[in-house]
Amino acid sequence: MEVRHNWTVVEVKALMDKPFMDLVFEAQLVHRQYQEANYVQVSTLLSIKTGACPEDCKYCPQSAHYRTDVDRERLMEVESVLDAAKKAKDSGSTRFCMGAAWKNPKERDMPYLLDMIKGVKDIGLETCMTLGMITSDQAGELSGAGLDYYNHNLDTSPEFYGNIITTRTYQDRLDTLSHVRDAGMKICSGGIIGMGESVNDRAGLFVELANLPQHPESVPVNMLVKVKGTPLEDAEDVDPFDFIRLIAVARIMMPESAVRLSAGRESMNEQMQALCFMAGTNSVFYGCKLLTTPNPDEDSDMQLFKKLGVNSHQVAQKPDEVQEHELLDRVAERVASRPDKNDLFYEASV
């Protein structure tokens, strides 16, 4: 199968309409052609600045437009971020993502962000940030500091976008992705399923992503987490089989990309997650929260990986580091005696 950048909505809908087993089987064949079998890359995300976001994204509890239980927090100190990164690495994560609830970063914040990137790199983790829209100059600064990935989701199709967000345009998002790519960083970009969009809109989202000049290196597929106080708190639930189909479609359309199972995983049982892995998922967020919404805890993840015979990737393996299978065994063994979850970690729909 060739890597394409000329998909149409009609083609994608035809994929989505295939018998479920045929679609998942095809996706797994593509996965094994382009990806390493039985491996899942593990990322941890920390909210480095929480709440009071001026954007009006209807799904987001961090928006200042809605009354939710999310408290406003200032930008974290660099040392606190690095402490969290060390704990993430010790827990088995290979990439550390830092998210800030901004429309865009201010110039006064850039020195702190650059120090965070350099510090996390020194710890031995890949780095990712999601800071809202960035200029070409800011992208260059982030890249120069060593940022590996920048997350900026398209969220949905261009046609449905205005129903969800009005404070930034679809083109604003595409421009940010262009700045990221031009600066030499890798792109993390996906969308959210379950916001009231149509089948056409779901197909349109993946067409936009797959028809970029270069596919995103990471494609997070989020299932809406309905939060009280947001306009989408009463949105209709997503059918699990429809969601798994979309994972398979993403794998087939973007075979070289990591397809990440992101927000909404807390509500998925082990069987649904296993089918997502079968359909082509090979990356997850790991830990107690997804920015401000629940996520399966790390022990549950490691136990599931062990049941499935899946090992998490390590970015840089030093001679004295614990081997992957030993890490899985160690975490599984300490489930019963583990202390309370550390609320320092957050996982996000990125």
UniProtKB/Swiss-Prot annotation:
Gene Ontology BP term (one): biotin biosynthetic process
Tree of life domain: Bacteria
Cited InterPro entries: Aldolase_TIM, BATS_dom, Biotin_synth/BioAB, Biotin_synthase, Elp3/MiaA/NifB-like_rSAM, rSAM
Record's cofactor remark: Binds 1 [4Fe-4S] cluster. The cluster is coordinated with 3 cysteines and an exchangeable S-adenosyl-L-methionine. Binds 1 [2Fe-2S] cluster. The cluster is coordinated with 3 cysteines and 1 arginine.
Needed co-factor(s): [4Fe-4S] cluster; [2Fe-2S] cluster
Coiled coil (UniProt feature): none
Catalytic activity: (4R,5S)-dethiobiotin + (sulfur carrier)-SH + 2 reduced [2Fe-2S]-[ferredoxin] + 2 S-adenosyl-L-methionine = (sulfur carrier)-H + biotin + 2 5'-deoxyadenosine + 2 L-methionine + 2 oxidized [2Fe-2S]-[ferredoxin]
Keywords: 2Fe-2S, 4Fe-4S, Biotin biosynthesis, Iron, Iron-sulfur, Metal-binding, S-adenosyl-L-methionine, Transferase
Annotated [4Fe-4S] cluster binding sites: 53, 57, 60
CDD domains associated with the record: Radical_SAM
Family (UniProt): Belongs to the radical SAM superfamily. Biotin synthase family.
HAMAP family for this protein: BioB
NCBIfam families per UniProt: bioB (TIGR00433)
Name assigned to this protein: Biotin synthase
Organism of origin: Aliivibrio salmonicida (strain LFI1238)
Recorded name of the encoding gene: bioB
